[in-house]
Amino acid sequence: MAQYKVGMETKSKIIEVCRKLFYEKGYTETTYKDIASLVGIKDASIVYHFPQKSDIYSAVYSSAMGKCSEEVRSYITKNENKEYLAFMLYYYILGYKNWHDENYRRFMAYSFNMANSAPYTFYNDYFSRFDLVNVDEFMKENALKLRSCYFMDIGFNKDVGENFNYYSENYTFIEVSTHTLLMYAKIFDMPSELVNRA
């Protein structure tokens, strides 16, 4: 049991160190040697916990999204549209960080490059964090809408990241985020007043 605990602590430390390194240096520039040096382990120990470097990235990404989910959870109010409001707030927080922090933008840009056609996994993880709905049922009923949001989000945010100077010179964060959230409202057949109220 003690060995398992040490292993989990090492894994957590790898994720925390990589979050810092990916943020400061970028994913591609971070080496196993960098990670091992800061964690205080050998390269082989990293591979034991994360067979591929992309596995580390996935763990860091999931952890970062979990922190964002906690921020959202602290602001959700009782509302007949709480699922949608949580969804909007989640993306607003991510968008705010993406807009105002160059290192975060670089981290997210890599996420969009790694994105595949697995929105089910992403949204299952997202909605499970809030305990708002029966996830399987909600995913089944809204599969097309969720896929539309997922791929719209990847494309738009990738474009913002790649052309940030253009967007930041021509639009405010509020204009861009409101535009995005209004598109989500349209996809989910929600009244646009919800965006203005949120």
Language-model-derived ranges and their functions:
Residues V60, A64, C68, Y90, ...:
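Hydrophobic/aromatic residues within well-ordered alpha-helical segments
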Residues A59, E70-Y104:
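Hydrophobic alpha-helical connector segments
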Residues M1-G7:
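N-terminal intrinsically disordered/low-complexity leader segments
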Residues I76, F107-M114:
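Short linear capping/connector segments at secondary-structure termini
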Residues S111-M139, A143-E162, E175-T178:
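Amphipathic alpha-helical packing segments from all-alpha helical-bundle domains
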Residues S128-K140, Y166-A198:
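C-terminal peripheral helix-coil segments that are non-catalytic and often amphipathic
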Residues Y92-W99, Y110-N113, Y184:
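Helix-loop "lid/cap" segments that line or gate small-molecule binding pockets
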Residues A2, K13, V17, L21-D55, ...:
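Helix-turn-helix
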